[in-house]
Amino acid sequence: MSTTKSNPAVQDKVCMVLATKIIGDKWTPLLLFSLANKTCRFCELQDEVGGVNPRTLSARLASLEEAGIVTRAVYPEVPPRVEYALSEKGRDFIPVLEGMVAWGTKYAA
């Protein structure tokens, strides 16, 4: 029998580590916060987040898309239009972001 299935405390730790791997870098919470209530194009995200290298932004968006947190819609236009939005899985993370903002607001300074 697996240790994680037999021990809820271990399972909780495993889940926390997995979640941190997905959202635990410098840019991801800012990207998710920017996408919380709207769809954005690449340049809009770059402007909103500020200071992120385009290669880093592209890699992070691809990773979030692969994890099922962000969706990417490509429109057949010239020039091509690509929009990013939160998936249902990503929208489920909004309360966590709000909690992070509340915690940061309470303890900032």
Task: Outline where the language-model segments fall.
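Short amphipathic alpha-helical/adjacent loop interface patches that line ligand
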Residues: 39, 49, 61, 90, ...
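C-terminal flanking helix
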Residues: 63-65
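Amphipathic alpha-helical dimerization/coiled-coil segments
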Residues: 2-4, 11, 33, 92-109
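N-terminal helix-turn-helix DNA-binding core of bacterial DNA-binding proteins
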Residues: 10-59, 76-77, 83
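Basic, amphipathic "hinge/linker" alpha-helix immediately C-terminal to the N-terminal HTH DNA-binding motif
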Residues: 76-99
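Amphipathic, soluble alpha-helical interaction motifs
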Residues: 48, 67, 103-106
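A broad detector of short, well-ordered amphipathic alpha-helices
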Residues: 17-18, 88, 102
